[in-house]
Amino acid sequence: MKNEACRICLFGHRNFDGYRVVDTQLFKLIKELIDENGFIEFYIGRNGEFDVYSASIIKKIQKEIGENNTELICVLPYYNKDIEFYANYYDDILIPEVAEKSHPKNAITKRNNWMVEMCDIVVCYVERNEGGAYCAMQYAHRLGKKVINLVDDN
């Protein structure tokens, strides 16, 4: 078990229809990562269906094993009207300065890159060779991050 937190970011395409395919797989993977790494900070956006789905899986695991070894952090590209709702759901909310100061059309890309830079492991669901999730996954590969694409296991 490590003494410092392992940081894991999760992202995928905006539209996600792989619920049945990855439900058990994602649940099992997250539990294994917790067992292997001790305390984990999960960095996750809120801009796509995979983000929301992944957060719900992590919340389910937190209810099952407790919250002492995990922190679910919502990383927003900029302030939005739902931030109070998010504050009641997530353990913490972050808005990276690099994203907040960029043009709104570029803020999600900046946020995704920031999450990749901050994390040790990337867990993603990327099935197309285009879009923001694909670009973030490629960025993670370029930085030498450990990347687990759930599509590859199906």
Briefly describe each language-model feature range.
Residues 2-154:
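Acidic/glycine-enriched connector segments
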